[in-house]
C-alpha cells in the first residue's frame, strides 16, 4: 500500500532531522553545566518560597497567640478623654416616649454577679445605697440577704434581653423603680427584621412602669474607642467583645460621683488563687463554670470573639483613684 506522507516520513530508515542550519548540538559538558545551573535556580526559588511561607506562618502564629500586655501597651497610647466630661445628651435614647436618663447620683454601688457575694450578708448595706446598679439577668429573689433588692439601674446586654424580659415578675414588677439601659451592636439592636429594640418596645407597652433606654450607636463607638485608647488594642481586630461590666463601669462613672463595686476580683486574682479552690462564675449558678477558668479562657482565646475580663479589670484598677472607685469582697485597689 502506497504511503501518502512525504518520503522522508515513510522510509523507516530515514534518520530524524538534525539541528537547524547554522546550529550544532551543545557539547555535553556545557549542557551539564546549564542543567546544574537550572537546578540551582529552582533550589534557590524553593528556599526563598519556603522562607517566606515560614515567616508568614510565624507572623500569623504570633498574632493569633498575642496576649494583652496591658502595662506596656497603655504607655504607648494617649490618655483617653475624661469620662466625666463625656456628652450625655445623645448617648442614651428612650425606648418609648421622650424621657431623659437620670444623670446624677452622688454615691453608687455596683453589685456584680460574682459568687464572692454569697454569705456576705451585704443586703442591708446595699439597700441603704443611694443608687444601685446590677447587670443582665442577675436575680435578687432568694439572694436578697447577700445582694439586696434595690435596683436603680440594670445594664443589660443584647444577648440577655430575652432572659430578662421572660421574667417580668423578677426584673420589672419586683423593682418598678428600675431604669433599664440596654446595649448592643447597632446591627443587632436595630436590624430590619427581629429588631431587639422592637422587642423591648413591646415589653414597654405591656409594662407601662418600665423605663428603658438604649445606648446610641455613636456612644457604642465611643466605648470601642475608649477600649483602644486604654489598651492599645482594636476591639474588632483583637477579636474582643466588650463585657457588660465594661459598659456598667463607664456608665457608673458617668452617672455617679463615687462608685463602690461589690464582688469584683482584682486582675491578678486567678494567678494567686489556689488551684483546687473553685468559685462559680455567677452567684445564682452554683453549678455553672468556674470563674477563673472563664476569665483565663476568655483572656487568651483567639478563635471567635471573647471578653477580655482580666484586661478590663486592669483598666478599672487604673481608674480607681481618677474616678473615685473602690472595691470590696474582695478588697483591692
Curated annotation (Swiss-Prot):
InterPro entries per the UniProt record, alphabetical: Glyco_trans_29, GT29-like_sf
Top EC class per UniProt?
transferase
Identify the main location.
Golgi
Tell me which UniProt keywords the record has, alphabetically.
Answer: Disulfide bond, Glycoprotein, Glycosyltransferase, Golgi apparatus, Lipid metabolism, Membrane, Sialic acid, Signal-anchor, Transferase, Transmembrane, Transmembrane helix
GO-annotated molecular function: alpha-N-acetylgalactosaminide alpha-2,6-sialyltransferase activity; sialyltransferase activity
Q: Where in the cell is it found?
A: Golgi apparatus membrane
Got any disulfides in this one, which pairs?
108-256
Q: Which residues does the record list as glycosylated?
A: 98
Q: Which residues lie on this side of the membrane: Lumenal?
A: 65-333
**Induction or repression:** After inflammation stimulus.
Segments passing through the bilayer: 44-64
Q: Give residue spans, biased composition: Polar residues.
A: 1-12
Record has Disulfide bond as a keyword:
yes
Disordered: where is this region? 1-27
To which protein family does this belong?
Belongs to the glycosyltransferase 29 family.
What name goes with this protein?
Alpha-N-acetylgalactosaminide alpha-2,6-sialyltransferase 6
Species annotation? Mus musculus (Mouse)
Q: Which gene encodes it?
A: St6galnac6
